[in-house]
């Protein structure tokens, strides 16, 4: 196992973020999307309007989630290449947003919830997160979001066209810290 931490805080956005338009070629030998760094999180948005948008992470391997839906994690549509980017098997034009984990910028966390009690989840940002997005991978759960402006008593419904709603349960009415965030007793974030 190779672990590439700790990492310096980025000084330029291009060190941790790349954007590329795919051509829908679906090649298994040439990456559809490539970044100048090994990306850790990937988001694909359909450029033709409508359709499904996907995201995946190096941590989850060749699995992906629908970003604008509740479906459980699936596989077979994309494949990570550790140094060259993302292979995507589709004939639709997508824009790929690629992110690299970095102190003070972005982290990817996977955990197993317990649904019975609140739980803290560790992260490696080194700063208090301003945005947290959570999606249960095993079943059809909604995407849940926390944002610093809305605070610990609200939940963002990422996959729905809803306003932030009151919820003292989702984040256990607890603000995140520079090392952990808290999930409450709800299946969307703790199952």
Where are these regions (language model features)?
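Surface-exposed molecular-recognition determinants
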Residues: 1-191
């Amino acid at each position: 196992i190779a672990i590439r931490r700790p990492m310096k805080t980025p000084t330029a956005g291009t060190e941790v973020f790349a954007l590329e338009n795919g051509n829908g070629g679906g090649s298994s030998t040439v990456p559809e999307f490539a970044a100048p760094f090994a990306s850790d999180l990937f988001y694909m948005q359909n450029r033709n309007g409508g359709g499904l948008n996907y995201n995946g992470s190096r941590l989850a391997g060749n699995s992906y989630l629908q970003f604008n839906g509740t479906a459980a994690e699936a596989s077979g549509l994309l494949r990570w290449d550790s140094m060259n980017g993302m292979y995507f098997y589709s004939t639709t034009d997508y824009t790929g947003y690629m992110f690299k984990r970095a102190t003070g910028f972005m982290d990817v966390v996977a955990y197993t919830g317990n649904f019975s009690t609140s739980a803290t989840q560790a992260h490696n940002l080194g700063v208090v997160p301003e945005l947290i997005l959570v999606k249960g991978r095993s079943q059809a759960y909604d995407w849940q979001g926390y944002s610093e402006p809305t605070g610990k008593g609200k939940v963002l419904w990422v996959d729905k066209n809803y306003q932030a709603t009151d919820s003292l349960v989702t984040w256990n009415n607890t603000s995140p810290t520079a090392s952990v965030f808290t999930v409450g007793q709800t299946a969307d974030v703790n199952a």
